[in-house]
């Protein structure tokens, strides 16, 4: 097979998409490269759907090979193991924009695999993998309603930048990933430093315009190397069976979807389903999934019709009303900060814990090791939706929701120089009926304020929905779980009163327009301000005092050439301080020393020990020292730990001294005065000049 390539200029760099050389037995395979970053992306679909398959089984796996960064994996086995959080999140980034673009009747097992085989620090392999997923599907025989492309948008010095470098991202006040087709935006995810809704919208559509050349390049590649698409049979509908199901269940479902309580509503729909199956299965044996499909279609139709035509939702709210909110803080006595945030039937128990630099997370990536001092972990136990399941590690959804909430809050976390703590937020979802990640954002801000973290401003989050039927459009504030399931969009926005800190959009239709997104952003702002008002009533500002169970961190500075004196040979000195006081000590290369302890007395003792280790003698100053060694010509007196000076025999007394031992012996405490320091740093001390003097307090 001949190799085909297309090149496209993108953000001042050249992206190359090639096919026909690697992985030729896959349904579709491309190699996407930019600079020294190279990603292989393959797409494979089974020849037919499994028997009884009633959903689309798409899986996306993104993996960064250690050799791509010139590294050997750590650990005993020395090979790549379970996916990192970054790999999991990137897999989700790739999945979300392509999932709605497969034909509804295509239910074959489909797998996208993106493998990073070379990586530099300037070209994001995740973005190349997203482009590659679309391109691999385009050149394959798999039916796909693409192409799409992705871009990361930053803003440096007020100017939007495509796929910013690491250096540019450090200066950027905005970082948003946009996936789009020719006509519409399909997925958005990112964060910003309290950006206005207008700026966020501009960034999104800057990204939409930027990806158009890549979309065209994929079309060109398909013309060069694509194969004919598979025929997908339209789903056949048994109209007679559909009519029977409608006659039996439609009226009951119409009443059921207006029941406000989630469990009661689901129970009633479950009863209607059971009754319908009991009536029809004797006649239509083996067609249970088909009957359930019709029931689901009727529920979908009735919920959407009620919203579009009547302007009212499942629980009776109009499109802009937020569910009732209740908030408690400080419920957990031993947690450093805690909050219980309840919005309707969604409830999050959120706790914040303060730690030291020892508690920072160390992350090993292709580009080396980094450290992370702000962590947020989101847990979604099965009981929160009245279910049971076997739980081990957090799933992709939990990792994704946690990262979204973390991104929303990290922009208001104080800098390390101002608040030298590691901060961990844990959100346990106790009940869920929509928008649990946004409840986590609200609860996380409240828990940090309760812990005394001086955050820049409170942050609230809200999930928006969309119902689009023909020309009829309804944008919903604070959506329920069923509205998420039956709607066309899940659009989450978090931020402060000043602006947006995080955004995420997923859609089930082929795209949303600028007008819809603008209206959703402005409606989300109104909802966010309402929620912030409720949060302000619970706790208006961060507490001025930390929890008595939180470590107190005191910062002192020493000269950089004194760091080795604090540490000591083999860590002897610092180990001695921690053992004697029970404190935790972190020393930075700059000479900054953070001392953490729940006891002020222990902290003060540790500071004194460090000051003693790093103190320097000053000429003319008095010191209380200890005689360490007696010689014929004088005595060596230690004035600080590890620092001593010589009291010459002539400086022992105003009278002539014949033997040093007549005045001083080893172990004696003696008040001395520093009378000089020579060029070699040797200290000259005098007992004679200190006679009659009193050591200052």
From Swiss-Prot:
<dbReference type="InterPro" id="IPR015847">
    <property type="entry name" value="ExoRNase_PH_dom2"/>
</dbReference>
<dbReference type="InterPro" id="IPR036612">
    <property type="entry name" value="KH_dom_type_1_sf"/>
</dbReference>
<dbReference type="Pfam" id="PF03726">
    <property type="entry name" value="PNPase"/>
</dbReference>
<dbReference type="GO" id="GO:0006402">
    <property type="term" value="P:mRNA catabolic process"/>
</dbReference>
<feature type="binding site">
    <location>
        <position position="484"/>
    </location>
    <ligand>
        <name>Mg(2+)</name>
    </ligand>
</feature>
<comment type="function">
    <text>Involved in mRNA degradation. Catalyzes the phosphorolysis of single-stranded polyribonucleotides processively in the 3'- to 5'-direction.</text>
</comment>
<keyword id="KW-0963">Cytoplasm</keyword>
<dbReference type="InterPro" id="IPR036345">
    <property type="entry name" value="ExoRNase_PH_dom2_sf"/>
</dbReference>
<keyword id="KW-0460">Magnesium</keyword>
<dbReference type="GO" id="GO:0000287">
    <property type="term" value="F:magnesium ion binding"/>
</dbReference>
<comment type="similarity">
    <text>Belongs to the polyribonucleotide nucleotidyltransferase family.</text>
</comment>
<dbReference type="InterPro" id="IPR004087">
    <property type="entry name" value="KH_dom"/>
</dbReference>
<dbReference type="InterPro" id="IPR004088">
    <property type="entry name" value="KH_dom_type_1"/>
</dbReference>
<dbReference type="Pfam" id="PF01138">
    <property type="entry name" value="RNase_PH"/>
</dbReference>
<dbReference type="GO" id="GO:0000175">
    <property type="term" value="F:3'-5'-RNA exonuclease activity"/>
</dbReference>
<keyword id="KW-0808">Transferase</keyword>
<feature type="domain" description="KH">
    <location>
        <begin position="551"/>
        <end position="610"/>
    </location>
</feature>
<dbReference type="GO" id="GO:0003723">
    <property type="term" value="F:RNA binding"/>
</dbReference>
<dbReference type="InterPro" id="IPR027408">
    <property type="entry name" value="PNPase/RNase_PH_dom_sf"/>
</dbReference>
<dbReference type="Pfam" id="PF00013">
    <property type="entry name" value="KH_1"/>
</dbReference>
<feature type="binding site">
    <location>
        <position position="490"/>
    </location>
    <ligand>
        <name>Mg(2+)</name>
    </ligand>
</feature>
<keyword id="KW-0548">Nucleotidyltransferase</keyword>
<dbReference type="GO" id="GO:0006401">
    <property type="term" value="P:RNA catabolic process"/>
</dbReference>
<dbReference type="InterPro" id="IPR001247">
    <property type="entry name" value="ExoRNase_PH_dom1"/>
</dbReference>
<keyword id="KW-0694">RNA-binding</keyword>
<dbReference type="GO" id="GO:0005829">
    <property type="term" value="C:cytosol"/>
</dbReference>
<dbReference type="InterPro" id="IPR015848">
    <property type="entry name" value="PNPase_PH_RNA-bd_bac/org-type"/>
</dbReference>
<dbReference type="InterPro" id="IPR012340">
    <property type="entry name" value="NA-bd_OB-fold"/>
</dbReference>
<dbReference type="Pfam" id="PF03725">
    <property type="entry name" value="RNase_PH_C"/>
</dbReference>
<dbReference type="GO" id="GO:0004654">
    <property type="term" value="F:polyribonucleotide nucleotidyltransferase activity"/>
</dbReference>
<dbReference type="InterPro" id="IPR003029">
    <property type="entry name" value="S1_domain"/>
</dbReference>
<dbReference type="InterPro" id="IPR036456">
    <property type="entry name" value="PNPase_PH_RNA-bd_sf"/>
</dbReference>
<dbReference type="GO" id="GO:0006396">
    <property type="term" value="P:RNA processing"/>
</dbReference>
<feature type="domain" description="S1 motif">
    <location>
        <begin position="620"/>
        <end position="688"/>
    </location>
</feature>
<dbReference type="InterPro" id="IPR012162">
    <property type="entry name" value="PNPase"/>
</dbReference>
<keyword id="KW-0479">Metal-binding</keyword>
<dbReference type="InterPro" id="IPR020568">
    <property type="entry name" value="Ribosomal_Su5_D2-typ_SF"/>
</dbReference>
<dbReference type="Pfam" id="PF00575">
    <property type="entry name" value="S1"/>
</dbReference>
<protein>
    <recommendedName>
        <fullName>Polyribonucleotide nucleotidyltransferase</fullName>
        <ecNumber>2.7.7.8</ecNumber>
    </recommendedName>
</protein>
